[in-house]
Amino acid sequence: MGLLDRLSVLLGLKKKEVHVLCLGLDNSGKTTIINKLKPSNAQSQNILPTIGFSIEKFKSSSLSFTVFDMSGQGRYRNLWEHYYKEGQAIIFVIDSSDRLRMVVAKEELDTLLNHPDIKHRRIPILFFANKMDLRDAVTSVKVSQLLCLENIKDKPWHICASDAIKGEGLQEGVDWLQDQIQTVKT
């Protein structure tokens, strides 16, 4: 980044660009969350399951996010690791109403946290305990317990209860992530 670029970021004329990986099992609501974070005139009306990955952009008050929305289908999860080096933050989405697949989500999270490109970095991780509007949903505290999030000691993390369709809980998460990105060097 050149001197003028740095100066424009400091003065707030240009937003710092951040690469974020959006991970989680299929049907957890990753694409719906990312879509809801975009300006209303840029949101898609029909959300389809992501095949492979897609790249989406949205802005917060001081950052410009480039989000790699990674497919959570089993056959595509091995692609995640190819993007770990580039990621400056992670959004991990969990379907809080799907207790049966919580074990699989924990396995994928453990694999992520132990990967060499992630393990030794203080990369912030935002967890969305999504689909809180559904009758079978467990609380974000219970999701945290089921995923053993308290064992994550070397990375800043935060969990937010969310309802991606209504947009509830999303801004809280993005605000936390923005604060972490601005203070944590990955």
Swiss-Prot record:
How does it sit in the bilayer? Peripheral membrane protein
In alphabetical order, the GO MF annotations are:
GTP binding; GTPase activity; metal ion binding; phospholipid binding
> Its encoding gene is what?
ARL6
Q: What does this protein do?
A: Involved in membrane protein trafficking at the base of the ciliary organelle. Mediates recruitment onto plasma membrane of the BBSome complex which would constitute a coat complex required for sorting of specific membrane proteins to the primary cilia. Together with BBS1, is necessary for correct trafficking of PKD1 to primary cilia. Together with the BBSome complex and LTZL1, controls SMO ciliary trafficking and contributes to the sonic hedgehog (SHH) pathway regulation. May regulate cilia assembly and disassembly and subsequent ciliary signaling events such as the Wnt signaling cascade.
Q: Which GO terms describe its biological process?
A: brain development; cilium assembly; determination of left/right symmetry; fat cell differentiation; intracellular protein transport; melanosome transport; protein localization to cilium; protein localization to non-motile cilium
Task: Name the consequence of G169A.
Answer: In BBS3; abrogates the GTP-binding ability; increased proteasomal degradation
Name of the protein in question: ADP-ribosylation factor-like protein 6
Looking up Pfam families in the UniProt record yields:
Arf
Question: Principal place where this protein is found?
Answer: membrane
Q: Which residues form the signal peptide?
A: none
Of which family is this protein a member? Belongs to the small GTPase superfamily. Arf family.
Q: Where is the lipid attached (N-myristoyl glycine)?
A: G2
Listed A to Z, the keywords are: Bardet-Biedl syndrome, Cell membrane, Cell projection, Ciliopathy, Cilium biogenesis/degradation, Cytoplasm, Cytoskeleton, Disease variant, GTP-binding, Intellectual disability, Lipoprotein, Magnesium, Membrane, Metal-binding, Myristate, Nucleotide-binding, Obesity, Protein transport, Retinitis pigmentosa, Sensory transduction, Transport, Vision
| Binding-site positions, GTP | 24-31, 50, 69-73, 130-133, 164
Location in the cell reads:
Cell projection, Cilium membrane; Cytoplasm, Cytoskeleton, Cilium axoneme; Cytoplasm, Cytoskeleton, Cilium basal body
Q: Where does Mg(2+) bind?
A: T31, T50
**What do we know about how this protein assembles, alone or with others?**
Interacts with SEC61B, ARL6IP1, ARL6IP2, ARL6IP3, ARL6IP4 ARL6IP5 and ARL6IP6. Interacts (GTP-bound form) with the BBSome a complex that contains BBS1, BBS2, BBS4, BBS5, BBS7, BBS8/TTC8, BBS9 and BBIP10. Interacts (GTP-free form) with IFT27.
Pathology noted in the record is:
Bardet-Biedl syndrome 3: A syndrome characterized by usually severe pigmentary retinopathy, early-onset obesity, polydactyly, hypogenitalism, renal malformation and intellectual disability. Secondary features include diabetes mellitus, hypertension and congenital heart disease. Bardet-Biedl syndrome inheritance is autosomal recessive, but three mutated alleles (two at one locus, and a third at a second locus) may be required for clinical manifestation of some forms of the disease.
Provide one Gene Ontology cellular component.
axoneme
